[in-house]
From Swiss-Prot:
Subcellular location as annotated: Nucleus, Nucleolus; Nucleus, Nucleoplasm; Mitochondrion
Composition-biased stretches (Basic residues): 369-386
Annotated cofactor note: Binds 2 magnesium ions per subunit. They probably participate in the reaction catalyzed by the enzyme. May bind an additional third magnesium ion after substrate binding.
HAMAP family registered for this protein in UniProt: Fen
Single GO MF annotation: 5'-flap endonuclease activity
This protein's name: Flap endonuclease 1
Binding-site list for Mg(2+) 2: D179, D181, D233
Ranges where the record places region Interaction with PCNA: 336-344
Keywords recorded for this protein, A-Z: DNA damage, DNA repair, DNA replication, Endonuclease, Exonuclease, Hydrolase, Magnesium, Metal-binding, Mitochondrion, Nuclease, Nucleus, Phosphoprotein
Function field: Structure-specific nuclease with 5'-flap endonuclease and 5'-3' exonuclease activities involved in DNA replication and repair. During DNA replication, cleaves the 5'-overhanging flap structure that is generated by displacement synthesis when DNA polymerase encounters the 5'-end of a downstream Okazaki fragment. It enters the flap from the 5'-end and then tracks to cleave the flap base, leaving a nick for ligation. Also involved in the long patch base excision repair (LP-BER) pathway, by cleaving within the apurinic/apyrimidinic (AP) site-terminated flap.
Lineage: Eukaryota, Metazoa, Ecdysozoa, Arthropoda, Hexapoda
I-domain, as annotated region: 122-253
Length: 386
């Protein structure tokens, strides 16, 4: 689910935090990609196009086709992807997972009714709602990435949190996902639509964490409380508090504790045993592997291994697979070109970095204005009247 309404809130109140770019502008960048989100996109996309790719036994292969060709496209554009897979979900997410199970059950009933009625549009709609990424999908995707020479990371818990940790450690430039909670976990950069197909012609949206905080005029902790108020995966939200009201409350009271002391609970009922403190802890100190100890390596593809894995039962075209492998090898050899900014060391971000940067920027602007004023005054005094 991510954070409800966060993308629009940032677009409305901190538009300077969003930049639209073509994929080619990320040449030379290393990017941590939310693997489960990608696999879901691939399964949905192929199903919505009306052709479910499958093995001779009927097992889906659309996730593998999507992963194979979309990864080649990223590498063709000089981007070095590292895929991050979800681990065990935190206990606090059980409520959200239960809601998803309920929605799935409702979709199954609706699909049955649509099938009996012969309504093709409704059948397609509810079929897509029933798509989910399984452990087998993830296992196959990891095997494919290994043969392609592309690194992946198994997160102990949430993939977005692990991606954010890799960004903060300076291992990669950004997190690529459609879930906005990557920002709540503190990812310095968030890329949306990076893994979308070229046919959709969607520009990549880049969100800057520092500029989000500056634009919203919040500290990192206040931003986390804002996200909890707006609605996250880890706890319920206060009924009647949407994005607009949430930002007003945070700006007025600065934290959830003070909000609860002042809010009109008859108008905005607070959930019973509201576990917002634990949710806050999960965002501040998520369960992640030590990013500094993770060694990311992009190696040459195993062409014969790819043919053996994708062709045969999975029915991929051998010629296309071999052509894909050659593109992978070519992009690996072309990666000797680097971005100019890669010559400079990327320092791991610190919790107070964004707040300090904002203060420093304000002080520099004030100093610059004073200097300019002083120069103008002295120039005026030294000029002779004509």
């Amino acid at each position: 689910m991510g954070i409800l309404g966060l993308s629009k809130l940032i677009a409305d109140l901190a538009p300077q935090a969003i930049r639209e770019s073509e994929i080619k502008n990320f040449f030379g960048r290393k990017v941590a990609i939310d693997a489960s989100m990608c696999l879901y996109q691939f399964l949905i996309a192929v199903r919505s196009e009306g052709a479910q790719l499958a093995t001779v036994n009927g097992d889906p292969t659309s996730h593998l086709m999507g992963m194979f060709y979309r990864t080649i496209r990223l590498l063709d554009n000089g981007i070095k992807p590292v895929y991050v897979f979800d681990g065990q979900p935190p206990d606090l997410k059980s409520g959200e997972l239960a809601k998803r199970a309920e929605r799935r059950e409702e979709a199954e009933k609706a699909l049955k009714a649509a099938t009996e009625a012969g309504d093709e549009a409704e059948i397609d709609k509810f079929n897509r709602r029933l798509v989910r990424v399984t452990k087998e999908h993830s296992r196959e995707a990891k095997e494919l990435l290994k043969l392609m020479g592309v690194p992946y990371v198994d997160a102990p818990c949430e993939a977005e949190a692990q991606c954010a940790a890799l960004v903060k450690a300076g291992k990669v430039y950004a997190t690529a996902t459609e879930d906005m909670d990557a920002l709540t976990f503190g990812s310095c950069k968030l890329l949306r639509y990076l893994t979308y197909s070229e046919a959709r012609k969607m520009p990549v949206k880049e969100f800057s964490y520092d500029k989000v905080l500056q634009g919203l005029e919040l500290t990192s902790k206040e931003f986390i409380d804002l996200c909890i108020l707006m609605g996250c995966d880890y706890c319920e939200s206060i009924k009647g508090v949407g994005p607009k009201r949430a930002i007003e409350l945070i700006k007025s009271y600065r934290d959830i504790e003070t909000i609860l002391e002042n809010i009109d609970t008859s108008k905005y009922p607070v959930p019973e045993n509201w576990n917002y403190k634990r949710a806050r802890e999960l965002f501040i100190e998520p369960d992640v592997a030590d990013a500094s100890a993770i060694d990311l390596k992009w190696t040459e593809p195993d062409e014969d291994g790819l043919v053996q894995f994708l062709c045969g039962d999975r029915q991929f075209n051998e010629e296309r697979v071999r052509n894909g492998a050659k593109k992978l090898l070519k992009s690996k050899q072309a990666q000797t070109q680097v971005r100019l900014d890669s010559f400079f060391t990327t320092l791991p971000s610190t919790p107070n970095a964004s707040t300090s940067a904002a203060k420093r920027k304000a002080e520099e602007a004030k100093k610059s204005a004073n200097n300019k004023k002083a120069k103008t005054s002295s120039a005026g005094r030294g000029r002779r009247p004509k």
